[in-house]
Amino acid sequence: MQKNIEQHIAETATNFKRGTAEMLLLFLLKERDWYAYELSKALKARSLEHFDIQGPSLYTILYRLQDKGFVTTRDEQAGKRIRVYYHISPAGETYLERIMRE
């Protein structure tokens, strides 16, 4: 019984964090386009360091948002490298607005 409760708590916490992270990223993307590194830094700063999502975890969330049609990307040359900028789509804006109303 205790194991089931612990597992349920862990799953609930994971789902809450995932949903909150998606919402916060969309909220930031509503302001402007960001590339992943600066998006990670802004999320950490704005959440008073409660959300420190970096590297693979951040890309997993961004790819999931992209698969849902909530985020699009564009490439931009920055010196010798190409930066991928993320942009909230109209569907992402609608999704975010509905979440904020609920």
Language model features: what each stretch is:
Residues 66-82, 87:
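Beta-hairpin "wing" of winged helix-turn-helix
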Residues 1-20, 99:
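Intrinsically disordered, low-complexity serine/threonine- and proline-rich regulatory segments
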Residues 80-100:
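Basic, amphipathic "hinge/linker" alpha-helix immediately C-terminal to the N-terminal HTH DNA-binding motif
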Residues 13-57:
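N-terminal helix-turn-helix DNA-binding core of bacterial DNA-binding proteins
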Residues 43, 62, 96, 100:
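Short amphipathic alpha-helical/adjacent loop interface patches that line ligand
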Residues 58-65:
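Basic amphipathic alpha-helical segments that dock to polyanions
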Residues 43, 47, 75-77, 90:
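Short, well-ordered turn and helix-capping elements at secondary-structure junctions
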